[in-house]
């Protein structure tokens, strides 16, 4: 159905994976912080977790907006080919560890209390999806893995998979989407 027109539905009655809501969230965050989001990410998250200086978050050349008289690039929320975050595996894993630790790093709260709990909560209309994270609700997303596992999945199946039962963060890069469930089941069997 992607790219095909559909009738608008009442909020909470229809679910479709797309980048529209993420891009709107990015624009809202620009207006909230009044700073480019890559700067906010570096200052509030990547710096405190000790990420390298090699990551970058890129927008499109035609994605500038004015916020309080200042031109800022409205970073795409989704990972479109050519835009989004470019990050190494080490930094990916550190971010996963921050999420696994409920937003805490070195006994410092990096994310608002309760945020990670909310992102792991199944949505009513799509129980396998929380706040931008895929959930293994009922073991349906990745059979053979813990039902409380969850993952961030980006373009090219770049994955941060978190298994709270085994205190495990797995980062997989450029994996065939069809192979992800089997791969994660094998990881689970190995621990």
Pin down the residues of each PLM region.
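Signature tryptophan residues that serve as conserved aromatic anchors
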Residues: 15, 105, 133-134
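Bacterial peptidoglycan biogenesis and beta-lactam-recognition machinery
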Residues: 30-39, 46-54, 87-111
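Active-site Gly/Thr loop motif
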Residues: 53, 58, 63-79, 83, ...
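Catalytic-site signature segments of enzymes, centered on catalytic residues
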Residues: 1-61
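Generic alpha-helical structural context detector
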Residues: 94-97, 117, 121, 185
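Active-site-proximal alpha-helical segments within enzyme catalytic domains
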Residues: 21-28, 83-105, 158-175
């Amino acid at each position: 159905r992607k790219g095909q027109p559909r009738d608008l539905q009442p909020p909470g009655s229809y679910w479709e994976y797309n980048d529209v809501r993420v891009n709107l969230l990015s624009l809202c965050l620009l207006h909230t912080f009044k700073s480019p989001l890559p700067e906010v990410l570096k200052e509030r998250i990547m710096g405190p977790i000790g990420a390298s200086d090699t990551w970058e978050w890129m927008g499109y050349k035609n994605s500038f907006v004015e916020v309080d008289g200042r031109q800022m690039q409205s970073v795409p929320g989704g990972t479109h080919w050519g835009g989004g975050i470019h990050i190494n595996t080490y930094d990916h894993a550190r971010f996963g560890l921050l999420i696994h630790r409920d937003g805490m790093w070195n006994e410092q709260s990096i994310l608002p209390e309760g945020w990670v709990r909310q992102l792991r909560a199944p949505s009513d209309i799509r129980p396998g999806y929380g706040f931008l994270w895929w959930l293994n609700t009922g073991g349906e997303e990745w059979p053979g893995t813990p039902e409380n596992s969850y993952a961030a999945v980006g373009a090219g199946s770049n994955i941060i998979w978190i298994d709270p039962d085994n205190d495990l963060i797995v980062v997989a890069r450029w994996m065939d989407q069809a192979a992800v469930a089997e791969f994660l089941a094998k990881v689970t069997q190995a621990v």
